[in-house]
Amino acid sequence: MTFHPLGDSALTIDFADESPDRERLLARALSVAGALEGANIPGVIDVTSAYESVAVFFDPARIERDVEEKIRAFVASAGIRVSRKRRRIEIPACYDADFALDLARVEAETNLLVDAIIALHSSSEYTVACIGFVPGFPFLAGLSEKLRVPRLESPRTRVPAGSVAIANAQAGIYPFESPGGWNVIGRTPLRLFDAKAQSPALLHAGDRVRFRRITRQEFEMRVKENSK
């Protein structure tokens, strides 16, 4: 475990040297982030976890000079024994050809039939490793090894909102229309980010996610419901 300054109002706790097991490191980061969030350390204003690290943001005017020592001592005492409650979220996804812009490419890369690709993608349980890139974008760990294909050589300038995509060992969902280089294999009618909501992002780090295949008709119906 190493600490690195992140400007003058944050620090990063890096766990990469603790284990070669990425799943264990992710569990460690999520556990420590959850513990720090609940610790109410004076001056700490936000905690953000990633695959192998945790960023702690603080108010320099309110926190004591020995912030690193306090956080180091807390993390050492909390360790991986501290667990975070995991929500389980189901994401409806339509794999219709109009939405699955890169399904043919994934089929060629994996030598799998379309139905097998969809079955593998929708039968796996994913963990939200972190939120980033754009507000509400979930980086999902747990993609089947059989579906691990490289990013597009030339990213799109516009990926439709709700696009369900995969790249290398990760899956993800684009909350907004935005540039992107992942392989789009479907689309969800859910809104992943609402700036007006009390909790703007639908998904949070540590959540468990499963995709449920839906028809085009159900997709359109859900979109209409969301627009009311």
Place the predicted regions along the sequence by residue.
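Glycine-rich active-site loops that engage anionic ligands at enzyme catalytic sites
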Residues: 1-228
